[in-house]
Amino acid sequence: MKVRAAALGLAAIFSGLQTAAHAADDPLKVCLDEDRPPFSAHHRGKPGTGFDLTLAQAIADRMGRPLKIQWFESKLDEDSSPQLEANALLSDGRCSLVGGYALTRDSLVVPGVKTARLPDFEGATRDDRRRRIDIGVLTPSQPYVYSPLTVVLGPKARGRTINNIGDLSGLRLAIESGTLGDAILMSFEKGRLIDNITHLVPGRDDLLGALERGDHDATLLDLARFDAYRAAHHDTGLSASGYYYPIGANRGYVALAGESALLVAVNTALADLQAEGKIAGFARQAGLTYLQPREPTIIGDVWEKIIQR
């Protein structure tokens, strides 16, 4: 009896070792947006690039696992939801982590629906585009970068000192309709700037191009977007004001709620990479202005905060 028990014990240990070894061989599957430079970018026939890709590789290396990227295309229409897109990708097993995810309370709430459609992704079939996926609940990692909005100045306003939104008074402002920047500028001091604001349509009008031509003097947009523009236009006449709007979002990974062990490993790797200064280095390499995560880790109702200000 003792011999049989010992044999069973050894079998269990051996089985556990096999499972652990198999897990180490399994690729770490991470979903990244194919069109969000300098965070992540991938075009057919070319290797992927970006801060999030380099960071994901470093985390996989720390975990002793190969990395597999599932590229996806986030929709720009009004009905799209980054939360549901990420949830569908995770729930369908396309990846275990979604990178570059904005950590807001609204983006992490329990979904109000039970199913969601997948975004378009590399390798998707016609059936994939039709399917609805039973979705779960998202859980975040610790953040690894802070993403603020910044004021970008056109050639005619170059050198203007901007310390707050009020300093935009008198400038010809351009903003994309329906964005956070739109809400901030339109609601500032009960509409003080409204008469100087021109609204452009996201995805149709070229906001930064119009600013470059001198059609407008300034705009308010995501800092990373301006980083990407500068990388693609080395001779740009646009300039960074150095002013960051005080409400921004940390970015991190999200996984499904049942992936606690994975998130512990990811958080350990992130903490080590942060302490070694590697994350800031990855950002410099990608041309991303790096700002360390800030408290609160998960921001509350962004719209409410803007209105209150």
What does each model-identified segment do?
Residues 7-16:
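Bacterial N-terminal signal peptides
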Residues 142-144, 154-173:
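Flexible hinge/capping segments at coil-to-helix
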Residues 40-43, 56-72, 115-116, 164-167, ...:
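Ligand-binding cleft/hinge of the Venus flytrap
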Residues 91, 99-130, 184-188, 212-247:
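A ligand-binding cleft/hinge motif common to bilobed small-molecule-binding domains
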Residues 28-34, 49, 164-182:
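Short loop->beta-strand "edge-of-pocket" segments that line small-molecule binding or catalytic clefts
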Residues 33-35, 127-138, 142-150, 223-287, ...:
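Periplasmic-binding protein-like
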Residues 24-109, 200:
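Extracytoplasmic small-molecule ligand-binding "clamshell" domains
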